[in-house]
Amino acid sequence: SEAIGEKRQVRLVDYASSHSGVVRDRLVEPFDFTTDYNQVWCYDLEDGRNKLFKTMRIGRVEVLQEGWMAEMKHVKGFVDVFRFSGPERYRVKMELDVRARNFMVECFPLAEREMTMVEDGKWLLDTVVCGLMGVQSFELTVAGAKIVESERINN
């Protein structure tokens, strides 16, 4: 957060990327955190793109003397309740029993605002997600959670 406030570049040392499967340093301009501080929005100076970096995958942070060079390109994207971002959008409805609902809210607190109780002990999550990986993983690993509808939304 020091680098954000001072508008300085940082080196994310030993960042472990699930996307590439590689652990390496990243030269970035951090400009904001997600709501839960699990991820940081950065402008990646190598790729010339805005990206989310998960804080738990960063070995350490080196704050550099260099100031931001690409501030006009800093743009936050959409992040779904499962903490995924990307260009794909799906409207998803998932039925949850009490146990699944509680687990979802504990793991993904932002999902709570998109849930409604439909009957005693039954909840419906109605949300937009960036791809289906997060919601399908939840359905496969948590008893009492079932996707009842998913539809791709045009961007």
Set out the residue ranges of the language-model regions.
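Core beta-strand-centered patch of the WYL/Sm-like small regulatory domain
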Residues: 1-93, 98
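Polybasic (Lys/Arg-rich)
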Residues: 80-155
